[in-house]
Amino acid sequence: MAINQIERAYRTWPILTECAARSSTISYGELGDAIGVHHRAIRFILHHIQNYCIEANLPPLTILIVNSSGLPGAGFIAHDLDDFQHGLDTVYGKNWSEEQNPFGFSQNGDSMDSLVTELVQEPSSSKEIYSRVKSRGIRQILFRDALIKAYSSRCAFTEISMLDSLEACHIIPWSQTKPEQRLDVRNGILLNRFHHALFDAARITITTNHRIVFRTRKKDKDISSIEHNLTVNLHGSKMHMPREEKLRPHPSYIEKHHELLGWEAPEVKV
């Protein structure tokens, strides 16, 4: 049976927040002993806690786990280690009692992988999963992971496959959605950062038959050839879509996006 690293993260979280309250660090071995796992397996747990802190814009809690050198291991990316003390100070200065353990959903037997699988296998399960996962940061990670799976790790507009550059873009903006829509992969597109920004700024969109529409402006005549290729040249082309039709952007979500962001009907006929 696969090990549920999220359940381990749930048990690790209070240990780290207690260390933060005491302004102390903890070694990999000490943490492993505290939760009953080998110290070499700690990195798999810290991956989830680190990602959560980054997504939720929290101080880098995993900076507290140090090796024999007194520094975090090679997998730590949440803070510049050239400024290690400042990273520690931000963690020590945070009142972690204000933060709910974000991994509580694991107590029902859920893992990140199992929830992502549910979202992709049955998109309508999104409302129920949203109610089980209380942390917005975890919800955002789940949504991105589900889109990565649905879109086979490729940007819908360019087919770029470098995961670090890919983001989860909501069709109906998060602030305008109902709970059942926030984790629905049919209300999302996997996009690179550049096109995600243009999509949210109403410079680029998709039609209900999944073609790309770019909104030109007079000042666009001064854009570079690279920008031209990534915008004007995409106009009218078919977006890269999930293989399974049930995972593709839903027309009702696309129409609502057009309404909210001011896209006129003639603009989205290509």
Residue spans for each PLM region:
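Positively charged, aromatic-accented nucleic-acid-binding surfaces
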Residues: 1-25, 29-37, 61-124, 260, ...
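A detector for short metal-coordination/catalytic motifs
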Residues: 138, 142, 160-166, 171-270
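A structural signal for short, well-ordered beta-strand segments and their strand-loop junctions
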Residues: 25-27, 156-157, 167
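Short, charged surface segments at domain edges that flank catalytic/cofactor-binding sites
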Residues: 118-154, 172-185
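Short, hydrophobic/aromatic alpha-helical segments in well-folded domains
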Residues: 15, 27, 143, 154, ...
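Short, basic alpha-helical nucleic acid-contact segments in DNA-binding proteins
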Residues: 41-45, 49-61
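Amphipathic alpha-helical interaction segments
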Residues: 23, 38, 53-57, 199-202
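Residue-level detection of the helix-turn-helix DNA-binding "recognition helix"
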Residues: 36, 47, 160
